[in-house]
A protein has these predicted regions:
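Conserved, mostly hydrophobic/aromatic
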Residues: 35, 277, 302, 320, ...
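N-terminal [4Fe-4S]-dependent radical SAM core
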Residues: 141, 241-270
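Conserved SAM/AdoMet-binding glycine-rich loop
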Residues: 12-18, 198, 210, 303-407, ...
Length: 532
């Protein structure tokens, strides 16, 4: 820590814009649980949720001030702003997918309109500056040097002053997990450094961990940021305040988040039952590349935490944040339901090939599982170290569908082992099992910036910047990004059975809102007289 800051008396933990504002962030709540359990004053600030709502309101006021000027779409979005926001917080809207999609796109239009004068393309899920890049440290420092250029600045400067007046602290910590948060986080940091020079600034989160664990890391932010944390932040923050961390895991504490105001039909409770991944054998695994050790919360404690939090907060849905839910945790959930519907990311495993086990998961409240299938070709799956084959995947999809558990399936095209023929077999597999697939995520493979699997590939810069997450590579089989995009657009997405799945995907909120649409669809199926 920088000298001269003074005694550590308390911390404000900030979740900066921009990310999906449909649930409170799990990481800061976990930090708050550890700090508060040891008597450290900790205030949580979801600047992402508050900031997006502020810009939605600012866009509406701006258009009203222009006498209703602007294009037809934006005028409609202004006119229906309150109705759309109320709808996104109501289960009824999710029973009408077309109306739901229009409400989401109208809300997104307002964010776009509010940020456009700043040269920023802002959405409900992303932030893209026409001049600055989050993968260049010089651009992040530029954002810090000129915070007034950020579209959130008029709001966050005033709101931060209010918070610091209400809750004096010695430190401000930023939880930075996504590239879409980086430029605004640094604008906020730059403002704090000038307006509140006595405050210590701490920076951590998943994105920061990736930066700091990359080979040859040299801190470009010294003098602006007082401390950067790689990996879990509980122990370093407790040490800052002279406290000793526990050997285990503390229950997350969500006090301070606006739990009734997120853009979902009821509270979505995020909970992480592990750090790292229990499998750790996939090729290009970021957990292995970054040296992240797998540390599970004991299943009994995870169930106790979930039951206690569910009893206290009454969530509409539990979001299990693990990279992959372990078989031990799934077994514990099946045996002792947490008290609310739940979903999370799971590997395709032999446990899910057991039809009775899938039914027990459904009975425990499981409404959706996200599955990283990646490919429908057996040779590609073997090369990726997935530990599965298409036959197992087909059986798992069938069992989950029979049990009434929706699936959100992730497919990855362009891995080094894939050929055009293998991609075609993925198309055939997906079409053949379309009845059992609820939603699809299609992605083109990005080669991680470092890791043992990158050796032997012809690589180059993916984008110009000193904070890269990915590298460009020449596909060893000539199956490059242009050809993959054409295949996806001209063949994969035009397959009728697949096109029907893709039309169901929630815009912007994607897998975060998919469980609500799945639950609404299941309710309609159970009650055919209900209008759709």
């Amino acid at each position: 820590m920088k000298s001269g800051i003074g005694e550590a008396t308390g911390i404000l933990i900030v979740h900066p814009p921009t990310a999906k504002a449909c649930e409170p962030p799990g990481g800061p709540a976990r930090l708050a649980g550890a700090l508060r359990a040891r008597g450290v004053a900790c205030r949580l600030w979801d600047a992402n949720q508050e900031g997006q709502l502020a810009l939605l309101g600012a866009a509406a006021l701006q258009r009203d001030g222009e006498g209703g000027g602007g294009d037809t779409w934006t005028r409609r979005a202004v006119r229906h702003r309150e109705e759309n926001l109320a709808g996104l917080r109501s289960p009824e809207l999710y029973a009408h997918p077309d109306r739901y999609c229009r409400a989401v796109r109208d809300a997104n239009r307002l964010l776009w309109a509010a940020a456009r004068p700043s040269g920023v393309r802002l959405s409900l899920a992303d932030y893209e500056d026409s001049r600055l890049s989050p993968v260049r440290s010089a651009d992040l420092l530029t954002a810090a040097a000129a915070p007034g250029a950020n579209p959130f600045y008029p709001w966050f400067a005033g709101r931060l002053a209010e918070i610091l007046e209400e809750t004096p602290v010695s430190h401000v910590g930023f939880s930075l997990n996504y590239l879409s948060q980086a430029l605004t986080a640094f604008a906020m940091i730059g403002h704090i450094r000038r307006a509140y020079p006595a405050l210590g600034i701490v920076l951590g989160g998943g994105l920061v961990t990736s930066w700091m664990r990359s080979p040859g890391w040299q801190d470009p932010f010294a003098g602006l940021v007082d401390a950067m944390i790689a990996g879990p932040g509980e122990a370093p923050l407790l040490a800052l305040f002279g406290k000793t961390p526990a050997a285990g895991f503390d229950r997350p504490d969500f006090d301070g988040f606006p739990l009734a105001d997120y853009l979902s039909p009821g509270l979505v409770l995020p909970y992480s039952a592990s750090i790292g991944c229990w499998w750790r054998r996939c090729s290009f695994c970021p957990e292995r590349a970054e040296g992240t050790r797998y540390r599970p919360v004991p299943p009994g404690q995870a169930i106790a935490d979930l039951c206690a939090l569910t009893g206290e907060l009454r969530p509409a849905l539990i979001h299990l944040l693990d990279n992959a839910l372990s078989p031990a945790l799934l077994t514990a959930l099946a045996a002792e339901p947490p008290g609310a519907p739940w979903y999370g990311f799971a590997r395709i495993t032999p446990e899910l090939a057991d039809r009775d086990f899938c039914r027990r998961l459904k009975d425990s409240g499981c409404v959706m599982l996200k599955l990283g299938l990646e490919s429908g070709d057996g040779e590609v799956l073997k090369a990726l170290g997935k530990g599965i084959d298409p036959a197992l995947a087909a059986g798992v999809l069938e069992n989950l569908a029979e049990a009434g558990i929706a699936t959100y399936v992730y497919l990855l095209f362009g891995t080094p082992a894939e050929t055009p023929g293998a991609a075609l077999r993925t198309l055939e597999f997906t079409a053949a099992h379309a009845r059992t697939i609820g939603f699809l995520n299609l992605a083109i493979f990005n080669l991680p910036a470092y890791g043992p699997e990158t050796e032997g590939l012809d690589t180059g810069e993916f984008y110009a910047g000193d904070l890269p997450l990915y590298r460009r590579f020449a596909h060893p089989k000539g199956w490059n990004r242009g050809e993959i995009r054409r295949f996806l657009e001209r063949e994969f997405k035009r397959e009728p059975a697949i096109a029907a799945i893709l039309r169901r995907d929630p815009p912007f909120f994607t897998s975060n809102h998919a469980p609500f649409l799945a639950m609404a669809a299941a309710h309609r199926s159970a009650d055919p007289g209900r209008s759709g």
